[in-house]
């Protein structure tokens, strides 16, 4: 490598010496129409030596000799221009103060020399790039022919990477929807209308690379257009990573709130001692990561799953001096009290819960004990140990619940919010499904596709709301930041998604139209439509994605008695109905 660099330096240095001397000679020759009077020979030779030293010096200063052929760009051309301009300026100053030494000397030769030397030195360096660019390219066996969608700077970067062979792609054309760009050049390609994709598909091209920055709705529309044209492999080019990645279902479905407020969350968490229950779950682990990200002083991670706790502890191992993993069930009040007395958290983020509807239907007693009694024990212990704020993660399934899980979460809302007072601020945050959470529909579909199995869903009309887990958790923390105590916050999850449409899109993205979709029938307690969430009577907050739902406190003595009854009753569904009158238990499914 050192030899190669030395060889390159020697080549460029030798070439530049020849070209600089040649440009001085040609400058004089052009000035005198090819016949240089002998009287000017002295001035020409002196100026050639001085200009040679000055130009080489400035080219070294601007690090031009460290640039390889293939990395020569407009930026390097600009540096050469400035280096040569400064060299000519310094020569002019020398000439101005020591003109007698040069006389006679034609001043116009300075300008001509500058133009020629820039042309020669720049052309030398760009020559290899030009040869590579204009050399007819042939597709290698391992490369995939593709269409580039979007005549942008991203596209130019993509085309450059493809030429260098770093992407495994072989672009055959560039298309764009903007009429003003049609017929212009993007690299060596003439930009064509999107409709041209049809003819490329007929020629066997099945891959499209999106080189545009698009909003989600625009991306969804473009994806559908590309599929309609016959494209079966859609990728998005990442400029920062210099790679073309597969478009994902998350790109097409996830709601991405525009009112995420990092500063508010940082102010809320910075230098605080925070306890997260259910720390190893999908929501809990993201809460832990964001607590560390936004400057929590100490994070206590509580979970009763050894594996989940190990996983999040390992993920945050770089911050081990700031985290404490506690393997503990929140049903163990004595141990929980010891933890709170030892670490004195100022904030508890309660994410521990059983969340899977079918399992809770089959194990209603366990759902009641874990969700309701566990929440009650944690909330009571927090208040007794003077924790300042308690934020509980709730669910859209708590709205007019039809299943045991949703109803237990509604009871948790009633209990925790009724415990709120001026010394113990409690808030609950409801939201829908997060993309990729354990046991949810998207990982299930991905596994079925990987195993060549049909995609199963319970009803063709079933719909759900989706949000990326990181965005949902940040909105939870923003809600916690603005909570004064007693609020039932609701997150705007965007538009509902039909699960059958989700299944079809995932098959398209996987190029697996050979797999079928099977309808299995609604399960016990399952809703067709989650009744999320935003009601016209809900109060707005400073964030457009966060609302406050109406909620009434209940008599705690009465609620405590009903919770005691839940633990010993024979019919849990009936006992829950006494607490939550709007509970309409779908025991049979469809």
From Swiss-Prot:
Lineage per the UniProt record: Bacteria, Pseudomonadati, Campylobacterota, Epsilonproteobacteria, Campylobacterales
Active site: 397
Main location: membrane
BP GO terms, sorted: protein glycosylation
Transmembrane segments: 9-29, 42-62, 80-100, 101-121
One Gene Ontology term, aspect cellular component: membrane
EC annotation from Swiss-Prot or TrEMBL: 4.2.1.135
Name of this chain's protein: UDP-N-acetyl-alpha-D-glucosamine C6 dehydratase
Family: Belongs to the polysaccharide synthase family.
The keyword RNA-binding appears for this protein: no
Keyword Membrane: yes
The protein's required cofactors: NADP(+)
Species name: Campylobacter jejuni subsp. jejuni serotype O:2 (strain ATCC 700819 / NCTC 11168)
Annotated localization: Membrane
Catalytically driven reaction(s): UDP-N-acetyl-alpha-D-glucosamine = UDP-2-acetamido-2,6-dideoxy-alpha-D-xylo-hex-4-ulose + H2O
Pathways per UniProt: Protein modification; protein glycosylation
């Amino acid at each position: 490598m050192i030899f190669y660099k030395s060889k390159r330096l020697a080549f460029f240095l030798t070439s530049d010496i020849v070209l600089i001397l040649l440009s001085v000679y040609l400058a004089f020759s052009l000035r005198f129409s090819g016949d240089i009077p002998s009287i000017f020979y002295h001035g020409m030779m002196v100026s050639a030596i001085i200009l040679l030293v000055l130009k080489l010096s400035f080219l070294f200063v601007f690090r031009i000799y460290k640039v390889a052929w293939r990395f020569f760009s407009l930026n390097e051309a600009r540096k050469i221009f400035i280096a040569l301009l400064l060299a000519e300026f310094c020569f002019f100053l020398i000439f101005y103060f020591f003109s007698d030494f040069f006389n006679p000397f034609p001043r116009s030769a300075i300008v001509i020399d500058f133009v020629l030397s820039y042309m020669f030195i720049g052309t030398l360096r760009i020559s290899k790039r030009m040869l590579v660019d204009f050399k007819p390219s042939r597709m290698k066996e391992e490369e995939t022919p593709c269409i580039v969608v979007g005549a942008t700077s991203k596209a130019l970067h993509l085309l450059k990477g493809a030429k260098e062979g770093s992407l495994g792609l072989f672009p055959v054309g560039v298309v764009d929807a903007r009429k003003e760009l049609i017929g212009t050049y993007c690299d060596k390609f003439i930009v064509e209308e999107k409709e041209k994709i049809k003819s490329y598909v007929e020629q066997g091209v099945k891959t499209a690379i999106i080189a545009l920055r698009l909003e989600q709705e625009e991306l969804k529309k473009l994806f559908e257009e590309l599929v309609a044209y016959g494209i079966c492999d859609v990728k998005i080019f990442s400029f920062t990573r210099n790679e073309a990645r597969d478009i994902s279902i998350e790109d097409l479905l996830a709601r991405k709130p525009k009112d995420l407020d990092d500063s508010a969350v940082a102010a809320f968490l910075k230098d605080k001692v925070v306890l997260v229950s259910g720390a190893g779950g999908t929501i809990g682990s993201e809460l832990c990561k964001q607590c560390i990200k936004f400057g929590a002083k100490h994070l206590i991670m509580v979970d009763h799953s050894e594996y989940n706790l190990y996983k999040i502890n390992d993920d945050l191992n770089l911050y081990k001096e700031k985290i404490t993993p506690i393997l503990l069930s929140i049903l163990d009040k004595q141990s929980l009290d010891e933890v709170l007395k030892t670490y004195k958290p100022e904030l508890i983020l309660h994410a521990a819960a059983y969340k899977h509807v079918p399992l809770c239907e089959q194990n209603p007693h366990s759902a009641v004990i874990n969700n309701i009694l566990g929440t009650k024990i944690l909330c009571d212990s927090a208040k007794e140990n003077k924790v300042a704020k308690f934020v509980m993660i709730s669910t859209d399934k708590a709205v007019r619940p039809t299943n045991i899980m949703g109803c237990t979460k509604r009871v948790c809302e009633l209990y925790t919010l009724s415990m709120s007072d001026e010394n113990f601020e409690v808030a609950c945050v409801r939201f829908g499904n997060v993309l990729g959470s354990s046991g949810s529909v998207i990982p299930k579909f991905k596994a079925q596709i990987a195993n060549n199995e049909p995609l199963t869903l319970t009803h063709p009309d079933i719909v759900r709301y989706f949000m990326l887990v990181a965005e949902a958790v940040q909105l939870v923390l923003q809600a916690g930041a603005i909570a004064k105590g007693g609020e039932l916050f609701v997150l705007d999850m965007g538009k509902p998604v039909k699960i059958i449409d989700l299944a079809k899109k995932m098959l398209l993205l996987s190029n697996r139209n050979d797999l079928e979709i099977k309808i299995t029938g609604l399960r016990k307690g399952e809703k067709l439509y989650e009744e999320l969430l935003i009601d016209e009577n809900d109060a707005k907050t400073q964030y457009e994605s966060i609302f406050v739902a109406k909620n009434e406190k209940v008599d705690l003595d009465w609620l405590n008695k009903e919770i005691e009854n839940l633990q010993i009753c024979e019919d849990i569904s009936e006992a829950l109905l006494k607490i939550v009158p709007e509970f309409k238990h779908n025991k049979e499914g469809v």
